[in-house]
Swiss-Prot record:
Signal peptide: none annotated. It comes from Idiomarina loihiensis (strain ATCC BAA-735 / DSM 15497 / L2-TR). GO terms for biological process: 'de novo' IMP biosynthetic process; adenine biosynthetic process. It holds the Pfam family AIRS_C. This is Phosphoribosylformylglycinamidine cyclo-ligase. Its EC number is 6.3.3.1. One of its GO terms (molecular function) is phosphoribosylformylglycinamidine cyclo-ligase activity. It is an enzyme of class 6 (ligase). One of its GO terms (cellular component) is cytosol. It comes from the Bacteria. It catalyses: 2-formamido-N(1)-(5-O-phospho-beta-D-ribosyl)acetamidine + ATP = 5-amino-1-(5-phospho-beta-D-ribosyl)imidazole + ADP + phosphate + H(+). The lineage of its organism: Bacteria, Pseudomonadati, Pseudomonadota, Gammaproteobacteria, Alteromonadales. Belongs to the AIR synthase family. It is found in: Cytoplasm.
Amino acid sequence: MSDKKPSLSYKDAGVDIDAGNALVERIKGVTKRTHRPEVMGNIGGFGALCEIPAGYKQPVLVSGTDGVGTKLRLAIDLKRHRGVGIDLVAMCVNDLIVQGAEPLFFLDYYATGKLDVDVAADVVAGIGDGCEQSGCALIGGETAEMPGMYEGGDYDLAGFCTGVVEKSEIIDGTKVADGDALIALASSGPHSNGYSLIRKIIEVSGADLESHLQGKTLADHLLEPTRIYVKPVLELIKHVPVHALSHITGGGFWENIPRVLPKGSKAVIDGNSWDWPVIFDWLKENGNISMKEMYRTFNCGVGMVIAVPNEQADKAIQILTDAGEDAWKIGRIANAAEGEEQVDILADETH
């Protein structure tokens, strides 16, 4: 007579449905604090419903998706999870605002080897913080516990956001003209890009993440959440004709600014118009990184670049300053010769 086979459960395979349900209960308060009047129903359904806000004549939906990249490795190792929730939202909504869109709703995907409810709830609380900062509703998401796919409690994140813009008010760079002023918005640090290089610099330099730079630990500088520009930029758009916006993310200045410039134009950047935040000087020195590599990898203290008519530059800077941003004139638009690069950074090698 053969031995009776054990009765297996999903939990035996490493998936805890009860933990997933506990997480849903924990995050219901987060969705409530991000609620918008257009949202219909509550979380937990098969799909989330959202009306288009009233007042749009020809509404165009704008969507985007992004992640946080290897900044997550630092956050996991240092057990500091809430900030990367803000990062996740920021990377999505800042891309939407580039086209003039008001973010409406956000969904997240959280994948892990073993679900730690406290860690996941901390991340989602940060997502709620980011949604509040951008006026965006957190309306749903997916938590995937996948043993064998991720090591232990390691996790990955993806965000999905949808916004709306009036068709006649889409910002697509077609109005960019010779002589336009370029306005910079300060970043809060590296944001969510360049962290594979940052982690390599930490490795080769043997840096102590608890060492201090200008009153903050290195860890604090590196895990500072990505700045969200939605509300200040929406306010600017109401009062100034914005010709283009560029979110300075992966690829830095060299890759992102040309994405919003018409053929035959270039951005002339005065690299001496601002002082880099100390973390970028630290990265350059400890990684022995060239200036060109810095500008093509990191934001170097600039999270967003905005093109406006030159005569509107002072007004634009004042509006952004009043909204709490550190804004300044960083350069101008000029004509580009055939085959010429679309970004020209004039700066001292040592900065």
